[in-house]
């Protein structure tokens, strides 16, 4: 009988949820749910100096915001806990002591200065830097001498000589390493805290993880973890290493690159929809059959096949993300779009926090104009700018429109029509434009474009009668007057 699939997402609380980490979590989530398996969250917090306040909370909060849930973890418990590595130190201690007793690991008393000197010497000789094994076979006398000096040892794993480590990667197919390319590596630091490779191998075994899906940058860790598995006689899980995410210059996405928004929290703050972010991330290095790109979470779960994980780097296309979010925005009701947009108008100082019912209705109508056009909530500030200014600047294309011979006649006639209106309703504005057409004989672009540019400052935009009605008679007449003088 085949084991139930068990996968894990194991973030370090060294920062907030990054798009790359979110993708790792999402692919593990889809892999588990597709196969009726278990999805586990484990917090790898042993690098205490790098942990940041709120890092763990951010990871969990924004995974939930994206629509993911998990079967075991720090917040939901489970039979394989604890799920936070700093709470598992006794487990690691028992196991590394076992390796020491079986001479599969040993204490290394070399100082940081000695290790650095060794490394520099290797580089100077054109060699690949790796631990040369200086303390691999210390005598009792040497050990006593180092301890008398007050040296605190780290513990190194004794890498087997002349051994091949080969595995069939779920993404890359067959991958091979040779043990002679590795020096004996540290499994317990001088402060008694286990290193990443030791703790991960122990946790993955004890938590009965069947598949390890992670980023390509972890592939060199795999043979070290395989060595630890073999040292304990444990079954080795299946590995899959997802390709890197690259920017439009085809360079690895760097957290320091501020030209790209990279943290899930930021997308939420900008008024993106979690379903759209989920959809976009699911296609970063994985592709469905066919050309369709917009799918629900349930559809992704149903069709997720690890065999379709890409072997090529995944391109992070910001414009595509905007397009995708727009697809989801168009499906939302107006209440949701207002909820995503209004806080940004408040933040920009366009409207106050405490609006009257009349003001609320007006703002709602303004937002409704851009419902189908909007890519994300914060975009409303730029899109709706013309409604919050007394005067508008005419773009170059608009200035050309206003040079037309018919423009003064059209605008004067339209101003007269507006003056006569009792209520600025879209239907009344539309009728006023038709009346100008009948009066002046101008139609099509010669009619609509001067009115649009003079009143909105733009050559393109929302339905013109609706926009003019919301701008209000006084503002529109002032703008027309400024054009015709």
Curated annotation (Swiss-Prot):
Catalyzed chemical reaction(s): tRNA(Glu) + L-glutamate + ATP = L-glutamyl-tRNA(Glu) + AMP + diphosphate
Motif 'HIGH' region: positions: 11-21
One GO cellular component term: cytosol
Protein localization: Cytoplasm
Record InterPro entries: aa-tRNA-synth_I_cd-bd (IPR045462), aa-tRNA-synth_I_codon-bd_sub2 (IPR020751), aa-tRNA-synth_I_CS (IPR001412), aa_tRNA-synth_I_cd-bd_sf (IPR008925), Glu-tRNA-ligase_bac/mito (IPR004527), Glu/Gln-tRNA-synth (IPR000924), Glu/Gln-tRNA-synth_Ib_cat-dom (IPR020058), GluQ/Sye (IPR049940)
Listed EC numbers: 6.1.1.17
Stored Pfam families: Anticodon_2, tRNA-synt_1c
Enzyme class: ligase
Source domain of life: Bacteria
Keywords, in A-Z order: Aminoacyl-tRNA synthetase, ATP-binding, Cytoplasm, Ligase, Nucleotide-binding, Protein biosynthesis
GO molecular function, one term: glutamate-tRNA ligase activity
GO biological process terms on file: glutamyl-tRNA aminoacylation
Binding site for ATP: 255
Motif window: 'KMSKS' region: 252-256
Family from the record: Belongs to the class-I aminoacyl-tRNA synthetase family. Glutamate--tRNA ligase type 1 subfamily.
Function: Catalyzes the attachment of glutamate to tRNA(Glu) in a two-step reaction: glutamate is first activated by ATP to form Glu-AMP and then transferred to the acceptor end of tRNA(Glu).
Complex and partners: Monomer.
Name this protein carries in UniProt: Glutamate--tRNA ligase
Organism (species): Bacillus mycoides (strain KBAB4)
